[in-house]
Swiss-Prot record:
Gene3D superfamilies: 2.60.120.920, Classic Zinc Finger, Zinc/RING finger domain, C3HC4 (zinc finger)
PROSITE patterns: B302_SPRY, ZF_BBOX, ZF_RING_1, ZF_RING_2
Main location: cytoplasm
Protein name per Swiss-Prot or TrEMBL: E3 ubiquitin-protein ligase TRIM34A
Pfam families tied to this protein: SPRY, zf-B_box, zf-RING_UBOX
Subunit-structure text: Homotrimer. Interacts (via B-box and SPRY domain) with TRIM5.
Coiled-coil intervals, chain numbering: 136-170
Annotated EC: 2.3.2.27
GO biological process: defense response to virus; protein ubiquitination
Alphabetic keyword roster: Antiviral defense, Coiled coil, Cytoplasm, Metal-binding, Mitochondrion, Transferase, Zinc, Zinc-finger
Organism: Mus musculus (Mouse)
Gene: Trim34a
Catalyses which reaction(s): S-ubiquitinyl-[E2 ubiquitin-conjugating enzyme]-L-cysteine + [acceptor protein]-L-lysine = [E2 ubiquitin-conjugating enzyme]-L-cysteine + N(6)-ubiquitinyl-[acceptor protein]-L-lysine
Zinc finger (B box-type): 91-132
Disruption phenotype: Trim34a- and TRIM34b-deficient mice show an impaired integrity of the inner mucus layer.
Amino acid sequence: MASTGLTNIQEKTTCPVCQELLTKALSLGCGHRVCQACLITKKNAVINPREKSSCPVCGTRFSLENLQANKHLANVVERLGEVKLKPDIGTKRDLCVHHGEKLLLFCKEDKKAICWVCERSQEHRGHHTFLWEEAVRECQENLQKALTRLRKEQEKVETLEADIKEDRLSWKCQVQTERQRIQTGFNQLRRILDKEEQRELKRLREEEQMILDSLAGAEAELAQQSQLVEELISDLELRREWSDTELLQDMSGILKWSQIWTLKKPKAVSKKLSMVFQAPDLSGMLQKFRELTAVRAYWDNFTFNPENLNLNLILSEDHRQVTSVSIWPFKCCNNGILGSKCFSSGKHYWEVDVSEKKAWTLGVYTRKRTLRFDVRQRKGQPNGYHRYKPQNGYWVIGLQHGSKYSIFEDSSNCDPTVLNPFVATPLHRVGVFLDCEEGTVSFLNVTNHGSLIYKFSQCCFSQPAYPYFNPWDCPAPMTLCPLNS
């Protein structure tokens, strides 16, 4: 392609008269280009510029005064002349400097081009030689392979760079999440400690007020006795001034009263506090907090199920709160309501606010057999608690009469075995943790930092398990706590 282009340029820059590169090229009206000297020296050239002459190539007549020098073509001719000054450079490069033969072979050991004479020389005897074209082709193939491999490596580098960027973002997100988790955890611990501090200070204030009230009462009583004694003393001193007759006539009464009067000592008040503050077990609190945080990871957000709602139960607009109302003249003993979700596998957790209620029951229920209960409690009919047994599909705890906490276990008779656990902190918020695979139902005192209330083990969930709630006839609301509340 390059040689063809060069040939075309040479044709356009060659004078058709002298067959040499154009010198002071002139462009004729017919389009041909000739040297100025060739045009003037032609036998048909005319000295008088007003006369007409003809093109030496095609014979077209033209006036000499209209001729113009082609400067662009002159520049091209000048550059082409520089190239033609060394016409044998490319040829010499293809010839052996020692023998003048064409370099048609390639020596693998010396890695250079050689001619056929070099191949037979002592210098290259025993060397591996190939045709120049084959060596070039092999070299190009090797270059292509290397290029392909490097491009693949480059792609790997780009992929690794992208992975590193992604890892950096991922780590930043993980670190940020962990930072927030740590800050949240310690903020919660600080709130717990603040709450414990306020509770201890409140207890101390109450004890202080009780002791001060007792001391104030004792002080008032002593003041009364002191006043009475002063009056008696004053009366006796006054009587000493009386006459003998007056003294003897009225002496028996005042003496008798003075003799029988004795000081009534006030009730002794302890000089020591009933309870000395002890720093809370931070490790135990932290462990309970960690356990609570762990189960809260399985929080299920659901509502009360409005289907088949008993007439004496009223749901809030968002179905997260249930309230019991009385239906005269009947007293309901089956106020149960289920959650809007059921569970057959996995781990699930929810929390219930019962802070205002004096009676409630909550936990997990699964259908084991058909149980029929009359919503009207007639005379002689057992109360609604007798059905709360695991063998009937109930794993529940509850509160009765505002202070009696109950856990309902299986028994050999109709009524369940009722356990009454000691609860140091009243249950205002209860957490329920269901583990279907382990077959356990755990109840946590969220009010007391997540301490365990009770855990049912070896639970059999042959049917889907439902969250269960019973507000009883207590009018205070029972509320499902929203996530992260």
